[in-house]
From Swiss-Prot:
Native organism: Arabidopsis thaliana
Lineage: Eukaryota, Viridiplantae, Streptophyta, Embryophyta, Tracheophyta
Domain Reticulon: 68-253
Keywords from the UniProt entry: Acetylation, Endoplasmic reticulum, Membrane, Transmembrane, Transmembrane helix
InterPro entries: Reticulon, Reticulon-like
Regions crossing the membrane: 78-98, 99-119, 173-193
The protein's name: Reticulon-like protein B5
Length: 255
């Protein structure tokens, strides 16, 4: 019996030692985890850096990703240069040479049909068989997807215009009015095709330059936005607050 008691005592002591070792190991691991968590605070501060338009994604993702974003950001310089060159050639053809779209389509159709007609007849004379020209048709699913997405965008635009027309957001109303006025002024300077070409060139230059210099542009944009907010507060206090919109809304509710 005495031997059994002596054997049980060391086992109990070993169990206590193991438990204490586990506790010390857990404390040390938790302290090490807390030490590792401390250096992460600067990254959290970096995440709060101001970005234009409040974006949280890279410029490539904002542009939709994929091939179009690669073209706009000049990831493939040959492809981007070719697209911009074709757009420039079209603009020069219609604006500087004053070539008309209907004439261009007719001339392209004449050349294409004439070439295919001569090639099919020559192929029949030489090979005694008619050439196989593939059938061209617009797929129904792709057309429906494009039409559905366009319908959704138009409905969303109508909802925004309706909310603005109801007078729910005066700030948004003023922004839309100013934007439409700027577009009307620019429309007097350029025709539609030139305006589209200018927008196309801007899409091929501004995002690429911004991506390269965003660390310099974003602080300047932050200062500009703060200044605009200050000016808007002053304008709101002196002008907008004096417009009796609240009383008109109250009368409308009572009526």
């Amino acid at each position: 019996m005495a031997e059994e008691i002596e054997k049980s005592v060391p086992t109990e002591e070993s169990l206590m030692e193991k438990i204490s070792e586990k506790i010390h190991h857990h404390d040390s691991s938790s302290s090490s985890e807390s030490e590792y968590e401390k250096p992460d605070s600067p990254s959290a501060v970096k995440a709060k850096i101001y970005r234009m338009f409040g974006r949280e994604k890279p410029v490539h993702k904002v542009l939709g990703g994929g091939k179009p974003a690669d073209v706009f950001l000049w990831r493939d310089k040959k492809l981007s240069g070719a697209v911009l060159g074709v757009a420039t050639a079209i603009w020069v053809l219609f604006e500087l040479v004053e070539y008309h779209l209907l004439s261009l389509l007719c001339h392209i159709s004449i050349l294409a049909l004439g070439g295919l007609f001569l090639w099919s007849n020559a192929h029949t004379l030489i090979n005694k068989t008619s050439p196989q020209i593939p059938e061209i048709h617009v797929p129904e699913e792709a057309f429906l997807v494009v039409a559905s997405s366009l319908r959704n965008e138009l409905n969303q635009a109508f909802v925004i215009l309706r909310s603005i027309a109801l007078g729910r957001d005066l700030k948004k109303f003023l922004m839309v009015v100013v934007g439409l006025w700027i577009i009307s002024v620019v429309g007097n300077w350029f025709n539609f095709l030139t305006l589209v070409y200018i927008c196309f060139v801007i899409l091929h230059t501004v995002p690429m330059l911004y991506e390269k210099h965003e660390d310099k542009v974003d602080p300047l944009a932050e200062k500009a936005m703060k200044e605009l907010q200050k000016q808007y507060v002053v304008f709101d206090e002196k002008v907008l607050s004096k417009i009796p919109i609240a009383s008109l809304k109250a009368k409308a509710k009572l009526g």
